[in-house]
């Protein structure tokens, strides 16, 4: 049961909030920032009960890793902090059909993870991404053309931020334009399952809605894959269904799971980074002016700073495979830890004045694309390119554009903006 802002307990100490309570994630951002600052100041990571979900068994609880150093070490040691035992994208252990369907490689360890990543990674190398540069550039131009035609006051998220990654991912896979809206709607359901706008008011049917959205996306790519097997083109689906690396290729189930991962991760996270980017520029006119003074020269630093503060994915979960001491804390075999990237990207031990948006910042690295190691975001190069091009086009043609009244996604997993009015 949700509570009103007036009923929420003020955050004075680490005992005043619960990361497993969905209402914590609906608090204002400054309260969330203060809460994680308190957690980073504790002698050892805080331990929490697990969220209660009807379709998952009750769990033993988890440690919240909120310091940059802890998240880097856990990410670099997948043999100790594994992803495949119950899944990485949810804190409770998920049924196998969920981890296979909605996480694909994210919810796997080696050797399965290495095999799948080896097959699909060829499409996401810097060399391959360079082949899409002209498409990204042209799409951004058309999006700003449409924005100017619609005029001030439209929804920046749906009219700008969501359009670019959706088009690029669908084009890469060979999904026809008539299905863009279908893909967009289903990905919203998968990542916004608890948000009332996407049907989340009926908690009892969340699992059914998630599975149905996954089944529909899976069927879309299975039909396309079957056609591309007989009639291959230059798109990514053709490459995946016909890929043969050391005698291996994707199974039909693996193709479906990877597609779901791609459209969800590739669309939702990049669109939220772009949305937060405009909000940050609106709140920090000095940084807008600085970026405008050298749009191309300041773009790399600005994009990294946007991703750091946006932190589109709040967390991933790991399970400890053997007793292990990390930075003074002993973790026992079978215990769960949750890697809060959002918190690590605001760690005072790494980032000077961490809440400040500073496009010249040099400290890091941030973990907005996940921590270092085998699960680092496969599409990071593409995401950086999309964010760079979108803001280059906006700053050149609509330099005074602002984002106001953002509506946040009701989610503990995704740090998302659903809607935001743009004014220019």
Residue ranges of predicted features:
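Cytochrome P450
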Residues: 1-424
């Amino acid at each position: 049961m949700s509570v009103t802002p007036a009923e929420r307990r003020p955050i004075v100490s680490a005992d005043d909030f619960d990361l497993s309570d969905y209402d914590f994630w609906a608090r204002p951002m400054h309260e969330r920032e203060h809460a994680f600052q308190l957690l980073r100041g504790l002698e050892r990571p805080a331990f929490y009960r697990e969220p209660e979900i009807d379709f998952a068994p009750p769990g033993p609880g988890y440690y919240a890793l909120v310091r940059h150093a802890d998240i880097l070490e856990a990410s670099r040691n997948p043999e100790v902090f594994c992803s495949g035992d119950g899944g990485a994208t949810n804190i409770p252990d998920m049924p196998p059909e969920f981890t296979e369907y909605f996480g694909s490689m994210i919810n796997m360890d080696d050797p399965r993870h290495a095999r799948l990543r080896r097959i699909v990674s060829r499409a996401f190398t810097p060399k391959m991404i360079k082949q899409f540069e002209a498409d990204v550039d042209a799409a951004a131009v058309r999006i700003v053309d449409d924005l100017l035609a619609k005029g001030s006051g439209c929804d920046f998220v749906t009219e700008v931020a969501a359009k670019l990654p959706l088009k690029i991912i669908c084009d890469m896979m060979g999904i026809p334009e008539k299905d863009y809206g279908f893909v967009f709607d289903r990905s919203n359901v998968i990542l916004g399952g608890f948000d009332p706008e996407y049907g989340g008011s009926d908690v009892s049917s969340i699992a059914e809605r998630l599975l149905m959205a996954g089944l529909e996306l899976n069927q879309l790519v299975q039909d396309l894959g079957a056609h591309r097997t007989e009639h291959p083109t230059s798109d990514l689906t053709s490459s995946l269904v016909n890929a043969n690396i050391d005698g291996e290729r994707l199974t039909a189930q693996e193709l479906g799971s990877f597609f779901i991962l791609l459209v969800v991760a590739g669309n939702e996270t990049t669109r939220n980074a772009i949305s937060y980017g405009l909000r940050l520029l609106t709140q920090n006119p000095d940084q807008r002016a600085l970026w405008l003074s050298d749009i191309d020269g300041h773009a790399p630093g600005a994009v990294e700073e946007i991703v750091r503060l946006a932190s589109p994915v709040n967390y991933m979960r790991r399970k400890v495979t053997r007793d292990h001491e990390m930075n003074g804390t002993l973790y026992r075999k079978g215990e769960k830890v949750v890697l809060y990237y959002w918190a690590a990207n605001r760690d005072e031990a790494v980032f000077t004045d961490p809440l400040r948006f500073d496009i010249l910042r040099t400290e890091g690295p941030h973990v907005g694309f996940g921590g270092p190691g085998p699960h680092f975001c496969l599409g990071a190069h593409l995401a950086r390119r999309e964010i760079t091009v979108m803001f280059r086009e906006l700053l050149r043609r609509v330099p005074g554009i602002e984002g106001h009244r953002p509506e946040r996604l009701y989610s503990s997993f995704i740090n998302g903006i659903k809607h935001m009015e743009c004014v220019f």
